[in-house]
Structures are given as structure tokens and as C-alpha cells.
């Protein structure tokens, strides 16, 4: 601990990594993650609703152009996997891409700005980037896998069809006895596959944004006059990371949904 009440570099980093939490253990709630996730989700819905309400058939404005570009890009991506437009898959992909993009953009706000303002009103900890909280990224990836299971249930007309679909791949047999014998191995591999999807989706998003936030914090330790060049360069590079991670999460979700359709 530094003398005079000053925090060491390690203590500053630790302070920025702590969420505003209520409760303990499994029942702990990260209030800052919940608040900013809901706020950004509502902002995304309001923004697209406003653009749609003001949409014109003539010459579109800048906001309408951007919204149409995003919509057409996602619709064409879905068509590439499914061969046709799918409003259900397209809506899911659009929601995930925009929501995660809004999450990630928060990482471009100066790292000390909002936490310092929150400290003035008695809030000791505040993390404003939901993507840097593994609880948020795991919740999102678990939701995606649960949606794929719901589609598996629907496409196979019930529980028995769902179990048959999950228990007949990747090892196949034409005979009934062979299918029964291979069912436990196939089903176990499907469970492992779904768990791997959850871990890979969540840790990829969390790891990239968490590392980016750490770099921003480390840059603030430099003398004030020397922060501009590395900070600006990293911010420009991070814009690519912010967009790319939202795209990767979206495209993998579409891939998983297309795999369900094919089976």
C-alpha cells in the first residue's frame, strides 16, 4: 500500500476490475453490468424505432442509410447460410450484433470518467463495459445455446425427435441396435459441444474487451503529455476490435442455428 493514501498501480487496476455488487457468492448481482446492459439495450431499440418511424421513401438521411446498411448486411449473411431470408434468425442476429456493439463501444469512453463521477455521489465501484464482465458474456452465450435447443425441439417436432437428433450424430448407424448403442456417446458429445460453444463464445468476447480495457488503464499510468499518441493509436485499433467481436459473436450464432436446421 502506498503512503499518504495514494493507490499503487496494482491497486488502481484492481479497483477498475471490481463491479458494483450486491449479495455474495452465487447470488451476487453486478448492478453496474445489469444497469448498462439494460440501458444500452433500450438505447438500441429506441434508436432503431426512431429511425424506422422517420424513414422516408425518398432520399434517406445518414442514420437511415446506416441502419439499412446494417440490416441488409445481416439479411444477406443469413441468406448465405439458409438460402432465404429468415425474419426470426435475422432479428436474433441483428439484436446480438447491435447490442454487443453498443456494449463494446463503452470501452472507448475514458476509463476514469464515469467511475470518477460515480464516486462523487457515493458509488465506490463502477464498470461501464458489460463485455468485460464474464457473467454478462456467459449469460449471452448460454442464451444462444438455449435458443438453439429450442429450435432443435421445434424442428424435430418434440422431445423424442430432439433426442433422436441429438443422439444420432456424429456416429451413425442404419440399424436400430447400432443407434441404441451409439446414442450415449453421441448424446455425451453433443453436451460437450454445447458446453464448448458456451465457453468459446463468452471467453472470446470477454477476453478481447477485458484486454483492451487493461491496455487503456496502463496507458493512463504514462505522463499526461505522452498519453495522446499511444492512447489515440490504441483507440483507433480498438474500434476495429469493438466491431469485429460483435460480428464474430453474431456470425457464430448464425452458424450454430444453421447447423440445427441442417440436422
UniProtKB/Swiss-Prot annotation:
Pfam families: ATP-synt_A
Any one annotated GO CC term: proton-transporting ATP synthase complex
Membrane topology of this protein: Multi-pass membrane protein
Localization annotation: Cell inner membrane
One example GO MF annotation: proton-transporting ATP synthase activity, rotational mechanism
Keywords, comma-separated and alphabetical: ATP synthesis, Cell inner membrane, Cell membrane, CF(0), Hydrogen ion transport, Ion transport, Membrane, Transmembrane, Transmembrane helix, Transport
Subunit details: F-type ATPases have 2 components, CF(1) - the catalytic core - and CF(0) - the membrane proton channel. CF(1) has five subunits: alpha(3), beta(3), gamma(1), delta(1), epsilon(1). CF(0) has three main subunits: a(1), b(2) and c(9-12). The alpha and beta chains form an alternating ring which encloses part of the gamma chain. CF(1) is attached to CF(0) by a central stalk formed by the gamma and epsilon chains, while a peripheral stalk is formed by the delta and b chains.
Family per similarity comment: Belongs to the ATPase A chain family.
Role: Key component of the proton channel; it plays a direct role in the translocation of protons across the membrane.
Protein name: ATP synthase subunit a
Organism: Dichelobacter nodosus (strain VCS1703A)
Gene, per the UniProt record: atpB
Amino acid at each position: 500500500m502506498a503512503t499518504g493514501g495514494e493507490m499503487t498501480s496494482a491497486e488502481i487496476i484492481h479497483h477498475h476490475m471490481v463491479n458494483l455488487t450486491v449479495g455474495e457468492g452465487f447470488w451476487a448481482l453486478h448492478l453496474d453490468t445489469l444497469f448498462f446492459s439494460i440501458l444500452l439495450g433500450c438505447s438500441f431499440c429506441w434508436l432503431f424505432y426512431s429511425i424506422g418511424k422517420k424513414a422516408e421513401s425518398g432520399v434517406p438521411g445518414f442514420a437511415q442509410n446506416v441502419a439499412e446498411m446494417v440490416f441488409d448486411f445481416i439479411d444477406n449473411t443469413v441468406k448465405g447460410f439458409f438460402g432465404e431470408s429468415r425474419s426470426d434468425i435475422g432479428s436474433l442476429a441483428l439484436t446480438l450484433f447491435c447490442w454487443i456493439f453498443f456494449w463494446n463501444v463503452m470501452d472507448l469512453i475514458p476509463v476514469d470518467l464515469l467511475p470518477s463521477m460515480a464516486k462523487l455521489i457515493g458509488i465506490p465501484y463502477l464498470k461501464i463495459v458489460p463485455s468485460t464482465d464474464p457473467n454478462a458474456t456467459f449469460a449471452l452465450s448460454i442464451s444462444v445455446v438455449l435458443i438453439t435447443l429450442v429450435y432443435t425441439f421445434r424442428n424435430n417436432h418434440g422431445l423424442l425427435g430432439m433426442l433422436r437428433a441429438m443422439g444420432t450424430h456424429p456416429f451413425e448407424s442404419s440399424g436400430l441396435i447400432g443407434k441404441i448403442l451409439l446414442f450415449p456417446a453421441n448424446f455425451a458429445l453433443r453436451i460437450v459441444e454445447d458446453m464448448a460453444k458456451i465457453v468459446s463464445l463468452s471467453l472470446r468476447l470477454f477476453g478481447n474487451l477485458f484486454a483492451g480495457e487493461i491496455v487503456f488503464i496502463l496507458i493512463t499510468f504514462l505522463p499526461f503529455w505522452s498519453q495522446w499518441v499511444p492512447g489515440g493509436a490504441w483507440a483507433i485499433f480498438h474500434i476495429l476490435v469493438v466491431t469485429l467481436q460483435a460480428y464474430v459473436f453474431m456470425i457464430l450464432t448464425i452458424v450454430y442455428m444453421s447447423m440445427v436446421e441442417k440436422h
